[in-house]
């Protein structure tokens, strides 16, 4: 009997000793959380998208609590509500959040452009891009394998006819999709913007015509038509200065290849 009881008691004693030791260590080596940081963290949506410029929600909350930044409006997904709650905690005036929405600067669907070869590898834009810059003829095109859609925390992106599309009603402007795109053709703009250029091709017009009938050919009709000088052709591609754009839509109406589109991000109208 003692042969069994002694080992059991020994192990029990070791377990109790370790438990006491861990409890003491937890008390003496505990890292006290900043109550202000905790309160701020609860105001944030928890997307951990990094759109604020910090590592995530915890990083932003800590920076605000430690007063290394006083900008209460950096959380785009949280919007004005989060900014107001943070400002109340810090005892400062709330700043307005510039809400943003993502869009894909490509309309090279399967109907208007071709593929260079049949890609049979892993269905990922990043992987496909490593093979001759992707399987689409246009090297600036959306590859359509959905890395952005997989990464989107709001399920706001879907693939339609070989091109990623953003549902502005779901998009929170976190910017995760922007960082996932290997071709860098997803952009964030203010959700009050009304006109976008759905092309990223910087080739000369003659070459663009051959590979995509929806591609910008740099004809400059939009630039000549814009009453505010908000759109210019830079490196063979129409580019909009949203600080000058009033959303009149004149550029879209004269675009011969229809790569400039009007949309309503606030109401969620799709392009």
Model-predicted regions and their roles:
Residues 240:
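Active-site substrate-recognition segment that forms the wall
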Residues 2-225, 229, 254, 258-261, ...:
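Ferredoxin-type iron-sulfur electron-transfer modules and their immediate structural context
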């Amino acid at each position: 009997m003692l042969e069994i009881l002694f080992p059991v008691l020994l192990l029990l004693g070791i377990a109790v000793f370790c438990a006491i030791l861990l409890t003491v260590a937890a008390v003496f080596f505990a890292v006290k959380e900043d109550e202000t940081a905790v309160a701020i963290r609860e105001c944030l949506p928890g997307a951990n998208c990094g759109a604020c410029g910090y590592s995530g929600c915890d990083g932003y909350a800590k920076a605000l609590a430690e007063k290394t930044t006083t900008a209460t409006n950096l959380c785009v997904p949280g919007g004005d509500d989060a900014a107001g709650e943070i400002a109340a905690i810090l005892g400062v005036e709330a700043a307005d959040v510039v809400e943003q929405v993502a869009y894909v600067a490509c309309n090279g669907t399967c109907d208007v452009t071709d593929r260079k070869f049949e890609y049979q590898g892993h269905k990922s834009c990043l992987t496909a891009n490593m093979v001759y810059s992707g399987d689409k003829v246009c090297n600036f095109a959306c590859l359509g394998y959905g890395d952005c859609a997989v990464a989107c925390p709001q399920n706001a992106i879907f693939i339609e006819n070989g091109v990623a599309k953003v549902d502005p009603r779901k998009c929170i402007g976190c910017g995760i999709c922007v960082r996932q795109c290997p071709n860098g053709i997803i952009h964030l703009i203010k959700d009050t913007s009304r006109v976008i250029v759905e092309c990223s091709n910087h080739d000369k017009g003659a070459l663009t015509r051959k590979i995509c009938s929806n591609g910008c050919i740099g004809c400059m009709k939009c630039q000549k038509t814009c009453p505010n000088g908000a759109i210019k052709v830079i490196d063979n591609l129409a580019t909009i200065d949203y600080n000058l754009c009033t959303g009149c839509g004149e550029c879209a109406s004269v675009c011969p290849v229809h790569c400039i589109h009007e949309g309503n991000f606030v109401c969620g109208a799709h392009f």
